[in-house]
């Protein structure tokens, strides 16, 4: 069975899972079980389809469905197959996890099953759509279904977080649509992506389209300064949904940037400054993301900020690849893109595991506040071990997967800096320094997160009474933790496959590019691909250390309370999250001020959107609503907008400037 047949079957099964959840909605547990189990089956099918595509079984579909002007075109190639496989793993783990975790939402389990399956199906359609119309339809469906999952608790925090996400998502949607429609206009009015690939746009048009799509998809990916919705929305969603959003959905932002910059605009050629811009935003996002995470005590907000950090790391590889491609350094371009794709998959796995671990802590203790945890290693050992693996992976500790992809990213940046272009050299060195700072702060942050949550003594009654989560939740965490280990130790096998995927993106004659990328990878990847040896050495050393300790301490170990300067130990004495990061927080206070201002801008956009659209407060007769109220409110809104032009709100002024700039750019391109 070919990859497209399997993919369509998985899509149909996801739709069946969503339908089953709705039909059984009055039987809460049955709806949950049906939605989760059917969703797991769909994920297995789509994973197999994705892997087949990655290994070279690229297929497509082109047929007319509903709209003659927009053919239903799907393309499952090596790049889209990789993202399909990535989301499938998270969807499978999330479905199994949901068998117990959705019990936290009584009366809403059927709703959760429906939106979860629809969310997964819409992401799959976004990745494979090969037509503007269906891409935008699927993208909007993805945003809407994830919004309803964010607000499922229907409390004040979830509604506020969901609203901010909804607005930023649609700001991004408008920018993406503007980019695609501009390409459509210059491609003879065609909606087919295939025609975009064959059209040689002028440098100005290509640049406008890329910039619009970069910020549009960047809003979905959570790059700074469009990141404000992540720490608001991710903590409010169910934890398996948070894992899918952070591990999967924001990667669609990366997919979109790659698709436009390196695929749809391929006939026009990549420009050096595109890569430099991407690297600069990547460096800023990586450093600020981890700096903001350090100050957090809410474990899910902390993980959300780390998503910003890792999106930044991925963009470093993407930007280096674009810059190298523009300079005809194809080997470096392939190496850098391979590093970005590797880290994309790696981040999905360890961030998915960490969010599931955070959900397990919330499930057992009833809180996301790390200050109220402590001592959970003894009470939740399986969760503690899985979370530790995720923490080591995200901190880039060998032999785990985060180390491998970050090592390749370093090598691609160093090689890009030596290509002779002064601007590329400066930005690449800046990016490498930013990556080093990010790595150091990430280790600090996860020593804090793990130590405060799992070590020491319980600091609340809930932590003292915590128990290990049910088996399905442990299995889901263990699966993703095991994949983190496999992706690290299996680097010698996995990296060449990803080199082939990267080469297929950068050039239709991928074999030539793959050979150059493979040669460069073999030259500079010794440490990254030696992870099996590192793993064996670590196992041997740990075994020797444990054996030595066992022999030396036989009959000599006595258990006693820790020394506390003569005072009786209590739960308030251990170092907590606040004091652990106090020195770093003091040093980086200006960055936290910047974060507050960025968040304020996001909220200003949300409030502006809310005032612009208005909110229906009551049900009224349709004729009155249409004939009387609508014109009246239209005049009022025009008057309010005229007044707000001089309202003194600088954030709104910025919105006007950006909107006007986009309009003028589009008009200038069309007139030129």
Where are these regions (language model features)?
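Membrane-entry segments of alpha-helical transmembrane domains in multi-pass membrane proteins
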Residues: 1-9, 72-86, 125-137, 272-277, ...
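Hydrophobic alpha-helical membrane-insertion segments
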Residues: 37-50, 170-178, 387-399, 476-499, ...
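Hydrophobic transmembrane alpha-helices and their helix-loop junctions in integral membrane proteins
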Residues: 93-110, 116-135, 145-468
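Transmembrane helix-loop-helix hairpins at membrane boundaries of multipass inner-membrane proteins
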Residues: 1-9, 16-114, 186-200, 500, ...
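Hydrophobic alpha-helical transmembrane segments
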Residues: 74-88, 203-217, 423-439, 515-542
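Membrane-interfacial helical/loop segments at transmembrane boundaries in membrane proteins
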Residues: 59-68, 192-198, 408-420, 494-524
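Aromatic-capped, Gly/Pro-kinked transmembrane alpha-helices
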Residues: 493-536, 547-672
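Hydrophobic core of alpha-helical transmembrane segments in multi-pass integral membrane proteins
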Residues: 15-19, 39-50, 91-92, 180, ...
């Amino acid at each position: 069975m070919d990859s497209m047949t399997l993919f369509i079957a998985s899509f149909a099964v996801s739709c069946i899972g969503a339908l089953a959840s709705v039909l059984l909605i009055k039987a809460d547990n049955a709806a949950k079980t049906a939605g989760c189990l059917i969703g797991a089956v769909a994920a297995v099918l789509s994973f197999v389809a994705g892997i087949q595509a990655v290994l070279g079984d690229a297929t497509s579909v082109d047929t007319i469905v509903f709209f003659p002007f927009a053919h239903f075109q799907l393309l499952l190639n090596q790049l889209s197959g990789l993202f399909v496989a990535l989301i499938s793993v998270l969807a499978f783990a999330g479905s199994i996890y949901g068998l117990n975790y959705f019990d936290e939402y009584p009366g809403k389990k059927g709703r959760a099953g429906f939106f979860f399956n629809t969310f997964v199906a819409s992401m799959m359609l976004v990745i494979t759509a090969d037509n503007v119309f269906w891409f935008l339809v699927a993208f909007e469906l993805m945003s809407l279904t994830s919004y309803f999952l964010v607000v499922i608790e229907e409390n004040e925090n979830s509604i506020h977080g969901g609203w901010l996400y909804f607005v930023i998502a649609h700001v991004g949607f408008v920018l993406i649509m503007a980019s695609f429609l501009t390409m459509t206009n210059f491609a003879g009015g065609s909606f087919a992506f295939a025609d975009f690939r064959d059209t040689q746009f002028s440098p100005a048009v290509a640049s406008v389209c890329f910039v619009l799509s970069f910020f549009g998809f960047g809003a979905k990916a959570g790059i700074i300064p469009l990141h404000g919705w992540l720490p608001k929305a991710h903590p409010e969603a169910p934890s398996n949904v948070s894992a899918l959003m952070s591990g999967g959905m924001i990667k669609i932002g990366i997919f979109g940037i790659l698709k436009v910059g390196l695929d749809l605009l391929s006939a026009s050629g990549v420009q050096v400054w595109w890569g430099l811009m991407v690297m600069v935003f990547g460096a800023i996002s990586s450093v600020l993301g981890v700096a903001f995470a350090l100050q957090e005590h809410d474990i899910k907000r902390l993980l959300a900020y780390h998503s910003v950090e890792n999106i930044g790391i991925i963009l470093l590889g993407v930007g280096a690849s674009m810059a190298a491609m523009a300079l005809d350094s194809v080997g470096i371009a392939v190496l850098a893109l391979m590093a970005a794709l590797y880290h994309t998959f790696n981040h999905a796995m360890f961030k998915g595991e960490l969010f599931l671990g955070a959900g397990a802590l919330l499930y057992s203790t009833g809180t996301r506040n790390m200050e109220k945890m402590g001592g959970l290693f003894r009470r939740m050992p399986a969760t503690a071990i899985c979370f530790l693996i995720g923490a080591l992976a995200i901190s880039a500790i060998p032999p785990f997967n985060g180390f491998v992809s970050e090592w390749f990213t370093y090598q691609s940046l160093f090689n890009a800096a030596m290509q002779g272009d002064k601007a590329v050299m400066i930005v690449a060195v800046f990016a490498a320094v930013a990556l080093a700072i990010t790595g150091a702060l990430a280790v600090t942050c996860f020593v804090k997160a793990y130590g405060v949550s799992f070590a020491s003594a319980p600091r609340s009654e809930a932590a003292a009474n915590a128990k290990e989560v049910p088996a399905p939740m442990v299995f889901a965490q263990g699966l993703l933790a095991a994949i983190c280990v496999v992706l690290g130790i299996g680097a010698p096998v996995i990296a060449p496959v990803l080199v082939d995927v990267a080469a297929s993106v950068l050039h239709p004659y991928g074999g030539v590019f793959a050979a150059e990328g493979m040669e460069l990878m073999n030259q500079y990847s010794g440490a990254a691909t030696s992870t099996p040896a590192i793993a064996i050495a670590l196992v041997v050393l740990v075994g020797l250390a444990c054996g030595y300790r066992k022999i030396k301490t036989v009959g000599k170990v006595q258990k006693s309370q820790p020394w506390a300067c003569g005072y009786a130990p209590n739960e308030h004495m251990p170092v907590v999250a606040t004091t652990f990061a106090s020195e770093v927080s003091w040093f980086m206070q200006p960055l936290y001020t910047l974060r507050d201002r960025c968040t304020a801008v996001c909220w200003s956009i949300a409030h502006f959107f809310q005032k612009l659209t208005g909110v229906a407060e009551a049900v009224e007769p349709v004729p009155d609503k249409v004939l009387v109220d609508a014109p009246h409110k239209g005049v009022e809104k025009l008057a309010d907008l005229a007044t707000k032009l001089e309202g003194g709100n600088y954030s709104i002024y910025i919105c006007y400037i950006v909107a006007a700039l986009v309009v003028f750019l589009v008009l200038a391109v069309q007139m030129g």
